[in-house]
Amino acid sequence: MYAIGAYGLWALLPLLFVFIEAGPIEILAIRVVFSVFFCLLLMQLVGRWSHLREAVASRETVGWLSLASLLMGTNWLCFIFATTTGRVLEASLAYFINPLMTVLLSVLVLRERLRILQWVAIGIGAAAVVVMTVAYGTLPLLSLLMATSFAIYGLVKRRLGRSTARPLGAIPGLTLETLFLLVPALIAVVLLWARGDLVTGSTGWLLPTLLAGTGVLTAVPLIFFAAAASRIPLSWVGMFQYIAPIGQFIIGWGVLGEPMPASRWLGFAIVWVAVLVFIGDVALRRRERQRQLDVEPRLPGTTQNWTDVSATQTSRPTPPLPKAASARHNAEVGGWQERAVGRPNGRGGRTPKVAVWL
């Protein structure tokens, strides 16, 4: 339910931006301001200020966070521009091809090896881009820019996780990223006001209320996403991510009435085939891992298998995980919980427990 809530709220964002009668720069600037406000409020509730102090004390971490905030701001601006100029379908296309772009970047940057179905999905996605380019006479630059910026943002966040001594967490991370964007956002607001182009505050209470809602819809889905990631397998979270572009497609085509000529239908259909191949690869990979867990190989030259050894080792009492000495300590270190992993081996062995970051 948390994953559905997160991606469902992200899917509804175009409806909010459509009703805001302001330019993309103003919407982005006000969204950053309200996002900072709500993130600081959440930080006060969860009490993880020590995470922020540790992050800003490291030059490397600050550098990666600055790059992440720049990419996030670019993605936000492109999305707002798309939704306020009648191009919601292009935004939807961007998030359909984003997983494929992420996989492609993992090959180019991280030198990872892809499975056959992943290459097939990327090839089909590239064919969709070619079809749309031929049909419209130009590359779908907005969709590609959104997908690429978000994919690079994911790589930067992955690198950022390796540069910190402990996980930064979703809320502290977003707080710092929006804080880095706060000064440019305030400068943009002042310049718009000086030129007489600032709409916020000049048309009554409705527009500021809607703009405040952008801050809520920035922070709340992130909380839901973090809750989902700590409760369900990551592969399931990856499946749920398509709720957002599907919802945006329905809003763009069915609610806002954006045109869908045959060439665009063909391009989207090819992208959907690529997505299905990608999902199929994830499902097959998950099944292979499950099959490997079910296999009980025997030790070489003996009749004893690995789970017998596991039973012997895990039957001994293990020391409990450290408990928080106080509520303040618990708030600072975040939520560590014991969670069972693997399966009971059926031979008297205990299922091991690990500490999971929530």
Where are these predicted regions, by residue range?
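Glycine-/small-residue-enriched transmembrane alpha-helix faces in small-molecule transporters
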Residues: 1-29, 123, 127-162, 291-309, ...
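Hydrophobic/aromatic residues within transmembrane alpha-helices
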Residues: 20, 27, 82-83, 108-110, ...
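Membrane-interface helix termini and inter-helical loops of multi-pass transporters
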Residues: 15-23, 52, 84-87, 130, ...
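C-terminal transmembrane-helix exit sites in multi-pass transporters
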Residues: 81, 98-120, 246-265
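C-terminal-most transmembrane helix of multi-pass membrane proteins
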Residues: 32, 134, 139, 242-330, ...
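Loop-to-transmembrane-helix transition segments
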Residues: 1-6, 51-78, 141-145, 198-220, ...
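Helix-helix packing/entry segments at the starts of transmembrane helices
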Residues: 93-97, 164-180, 219-254
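Hydrophobic alpha-helical transmembrane segments of multi-pass integral membrane proteins
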Residues: 1, 27-44, 164-218
